[in-house]
Amino acid sequence: DKNGRFIMNEAWAKLNFGKNFFAQLGRQTLSYDDERILGGLDWNIAGRYHDALKLGYADPNNQLHLILAFNQNDETKIGGTYYVQAGAQPYKNMQTLWYHYKSDYTPFDASLLFMNLGLETGDAATKESHTRYLQTMGTYITYKDNGWNVDGAFYYQMGKNLNAEKVSAFMASLQAAYAIDKTWTVVASADYLSGDSGDSDKYKAFNVLYGTHHKFYGAMDYFYASDFKNGYAPGLFDKRLGVRFCASDKVDMDLNYHHFSTAAKLPNLKKALGSEVDYQINWSVMKDVKLSAGYSFMRGTETMDVVKGGNHKSWQDWGWV
C-alpha cells in the first residue's frame, strides 16, 4: 500500500503456445544459472522481483528467454522517472536475452547472457533526468562427470554508469569440487571482480547487479551484500578451500576458508582484506523439514577498515540457527 506496509512479492500469468513457446507477464522472480547476475534472493520480507514480460522457447536441449521490463512509479521523483538506487526500482528499463544448451552426449552445459540495463539519474530540483545504459554479457559453463563438478563464468560490462562514466569491467569465477567417496567432497574456487582505482579514463568496477550475493563471497556478507565505504570500489579477489562431510543420509556439514583481497591497487593500502571461516551443519528432520546451524568468523586488515568500516582488531563472528 502507499504507507509501505503491504507489498506484492509475486503475481504473474503464463500462457503456453504449443509445446515449446510461452509468455509470462507480471511480477516475477528472475533466476538464471548460478545466480551471479540474476538471482531469486529471498532473505528479506519482500524478496527480489521484477515487473517484466518473459517470452520463452524450450525443448529437451535448448532454452531461450527474452525478458523485457519497464518501471514507472508516480510516487518517485520527477514524475516517476528518477529512481533512487536504494529503492525497490533500481532500473527504468531492462532487456535481457538468455540461452542455455544441454547436451545429450557430453557432460557439459553452457549458457549465454546479454543484458541491456537503463539506469536513470537526474536532479529533482531542475527536474532533469538522464538514462544511462549499461551492457552486461557473458557465459556460464558446467561440467559434471566421474565425481567432478566444475563450473565457471565470465562476464564483461560496457556502456555508462549513473555518473556518465564509460565502463570497462569484468568478473570471472571458477569452482571445482571432487567427490572422493559418498562421504567426503573437497572444493576449491576463485572469484575475481574487477575494481576501480581511480587512475583510468574508464570505470573498471564490476556491478554485480541482481545476483544472489549471499551465495558467494563468504557467509558473513561483507562483500556486495552491502556497499563499500568512503567512495571506494576496489573489486574483490576471493580464494576458497572447502570440504563437505556427509555423516548420513540426513546429516551433512560444510567447512570453508576464504581469503579476500582487493582486485584494484588502492593508494597507500595493501590489497589483503582478511580471512573468513564458515561452518554449517544441516539435518533433514523429515520430509520438507530441515534444520541448519552455522558459525563464521572474520579476521580483517587495516585495508578492510578503510574500504568497509569497522575495526579489524575486534573479534568479528556470527552464529545462527
Residues of each region from the PLM?
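Extracellular/periplasmic loop regions
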Residues: 127, 149-153, 157, 162-246, ...
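Outer membrane beta-barrel
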Residues: 1-75, 96, 100-104, 109, ...
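Outer-membrane beta-barrel "beta-signal"
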Residues: 314-321
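Outer-membrane beta-barrel translocator domains and adjoining extracellular loop/strand segments
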Residues: 35-42, 75-86, 121-134, 162-171, ...
